[in-house]
């Protein structure tokens, strides 16, 4: 984000002496994107931020994927993936991979326990809070998050998730191999959100703090690139990473609640790009929120049938009643995967039922990817095998 923030104790000039009350020096760390050519922040640590005293492999949950072959639309019931074990599960180690490709991985987790300290060395994360409450503690400070929040965590940000509600924390995790930003068309050339953007800087919540935590020989989990894909390392650092007395800059984690998204509507059906909220390399994130729908006298409010020949479409249904999917078995916590090369659209009867409807009370998060998605173990474990045949009245192989 080009939106500048300052928190805690920073010196008047960057790259100059910043002394402790005892006369020692704080250690300055520049955290920046694209080398030294994009957004960055300067953090001032009590300890040396590069110090480690141990490093060993961290065994990640399964990252294996299976091609979508034969090519069919799929329905994944994510709420089936977790039972009572959620109480001892955390948002980092408990993620189950649902879908992925070389640009983005989508996981789901239901958690009740605090995570270990963690940073993603591959790319930014966008975690959508389907339900529950948590505090996200980071080197930049803390964020209190709740249902409907998108939490954007920049690459290499050390943080941990601490559930704070009485019930489970349900998190839909989008992990990029790139940065996740507002769409370029929403931004001025200096990075300000423009008048036509469906949200603005006032809607974004930054960290508060700073956090100052004492500790010695603290473990930090790091997800990073390996020869055969995504791997993990467990560092032990000599002092707690939450030792930042102050920072300033334009790179930091932030939260944005889906209820603050202002939907763009029209007389006839508007295409998915008007619902876009973020973008990464070779994928976009959109949301479909409660809204007034098409008001042309002959409009058909549900989507027309379409073939997205260049992308796979993933819809995560997280609230309301999704009109176009009535009769498909899809409900809250469902994912639909409609792959490129396959025509998709409303279920039978939805076209006709939508005529005259003036308002859609629906909430869904969509990820469109420009490379084919494969199924992770969480995807294969939660699949509804009958979904592909629902446009044909249930007629399918062996039926």
Which ranges hold each PLM region?
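Jelly-roll (double-stranded beta-helix
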Residues: 1-399
């Amino acid at each position: 984000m080009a939106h500048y923030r300052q928190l805690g104790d920073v010196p008047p000039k960057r790259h100059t002496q910043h002394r402790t009350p005892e006369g020692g020096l704080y250690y300055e760390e520049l955290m920046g994107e694209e080398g030294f050519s994009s957004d960055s922040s300067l953090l001032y640590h009590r300890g040396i931020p590069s110090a480690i005293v141990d490093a060993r492999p961290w065994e990640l949950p399964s990252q294996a994927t299976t091609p979508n072959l034969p090519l069919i639309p799929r329905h994944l019931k994510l709420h089936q993936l977790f039972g009572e074990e959620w109480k001892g599960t955390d948002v980092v180690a408990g993620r189950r991979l649902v879908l992925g490709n070389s640009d983005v991985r989508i996981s789901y987790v239901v958690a009740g326990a605090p995570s270990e300290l963690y940073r993603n060395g591959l790319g930014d994360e966008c975690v959508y809070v389907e339900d529950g409450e948590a505090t996200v503690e980071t080197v930049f400070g803390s964020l209190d998050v709740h249902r409907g929040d998108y939490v954007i965590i920049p690459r290499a940000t050390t943080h941990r998730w601490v559930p704070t509600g009485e019930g489970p924390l349900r998190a839909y995790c989008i992990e990029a191999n790139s940065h996740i930003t507002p769409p370029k068309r929403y931004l001025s050339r200096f990075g300000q959100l423009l008048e036509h953007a469906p949200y603005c800087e006032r809607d974004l919540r930054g960290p508060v703090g700073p956090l100052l935590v004492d500790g010695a020989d603290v473990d930090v989990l790091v997800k990073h690139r390996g020869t055969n894909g995504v791997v993990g390392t467990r560092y032990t650092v000599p002092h707690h990473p939450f030792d930042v007395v102050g920072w300033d800059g334009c790179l930091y984690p932030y939260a944005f609640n889906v209820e603050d998204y202002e939907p763009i509507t029209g007389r006839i059906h508007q295409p998915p790009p008007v619902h876009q909220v973020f973008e990464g390399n070779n994928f976009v994130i959109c949301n479909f929120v409660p809204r007034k729908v098409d008001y042309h006298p002959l409009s058909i409010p549900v989507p027309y049938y379409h073939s997205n020949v260049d992308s796979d479409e993933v819809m995560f249904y997280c609230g309301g009643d999704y009109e176009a999917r009535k009769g498909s078995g899809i409900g809250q916590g469902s994912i639909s995967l409609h792959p490129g090369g396959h025509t998709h659209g409303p279920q039978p009867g939805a076209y006709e039922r939508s005529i005259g409807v003036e308002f859609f009370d629906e909430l869904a998060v969509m990820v469109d990817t420009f490379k084919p998605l494969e199924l992770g173990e969480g995807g294969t474990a939660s699949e509804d095998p009958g979904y592909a045949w629902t446009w044909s009245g249930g007629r399918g192989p062996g039926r």
